[in-house]
Each structure stands twice: as structure tokens, then as C-alpha cells.
Amino acid sequence: MNIRPLHDRVIVKRLEVESKSAGGIVLTGSAAEKSTRGEILAVGNGRLLENGTVKPLDVKVGDVVIFNEGYGVKKEKIDGEEVLILSEADLMAVVG
């Protein structure tokens, strides 16, 4: 995958989760909830501060994160694979 996010943006591959109902039935498609966990595939250089310096991101390639899939999240297909482009501010936690 040849993509480089700009500024404080990251490229995330959503992690698959197996969704089961309370009765143990595996849910698929629209009945299953989408995961809000993903693996960081690429990171931008950082956020430009008012004093002109660049603050590096707190995450790195390979980190598993929990993200907020809100207004600023962009879905794209790169090399046939769906990825999410989002700002570091949309990341809520690093797992592990």
C-alpha cells in the first residue's frame, strides 16, 4: 500500500470482530456492529503548532487503536482494501 497521510492524520485498517447475539448466533452484514478498533498502517508527520514546530503523533505504525468513527473519518479503498483516514484527535486509546 503506497499512501502517506498528511499532518496529524493516520491510515487505519478496521479490525474484524465476530459479532454474536445473546443466543450465540453469529451476526453478519448490517446486523453486526462494525468494530471501532483498527491497526495503524501509516502516520503523518505530526500537527503543526502555532509556534511553527511540528508535534509528532503519539501513535506509530502497528499500534492497535480504538477510534471514534465520526464526522471527520474518511473511508477509502486503497489497493482493493477499505481503510479509514482520520485525525489523531479521533483516536481514543491505544490497546495493549
From Swiss-Prot:
UniProt-annotated location(s): Cytoplasm
GO cellular component terms, semicolon-separated: cytoplasm
Gene3D superfamilies according to UniProt: GroES chaperonin (2.30.33.40)
Pfam families the UniProt entry points to: Cpn10
Gene Ontology terms describing biological process: chaperone cofactor-dependent protein refolding
Record-level Gene Ontology MF annotations: ATP binding; metal ion binding; protein folding chaperone; protein-folding chaperone binding; unfolded protein binding
InterPro entries linked to this entry: Chaperonin_GroES (IPR020818), Chaperonin_GroES_sf (IPR037124), Chaprnonin_Cpn10_CS (IPR018369), GroES-like_sf (IPR011032)
Top-level taxon in the UniProt lineage: Bacteria
Key words, A-Z: Chaperone, Cytoplasm
Family classification: Belongs to the GroES chaperonin family.
Subunit structure: Heptamer of 7 subunits arranged in a ring. Interacts with the chaperonin GroEL.
Cited HAMAP family: CH10
Cited function: Together with the chaperonin GroEL, plays an essential role in assisting protein folding. The GroEL-GroES system forms a nano-cage that allows encapsulation of the non-native substrate proteins and provides a physical environment optimized to promote and accelerate protein folding. GroES binds to the apical surface of the GroEL ring, thereby capping the opening of the GroEL channel.
The protein's name in its UniProt record: Co-chaperonin GroES
Organism: Shewanella denitrificans (strain OS217 / ATCC BAA-1090 / DSM 15013)
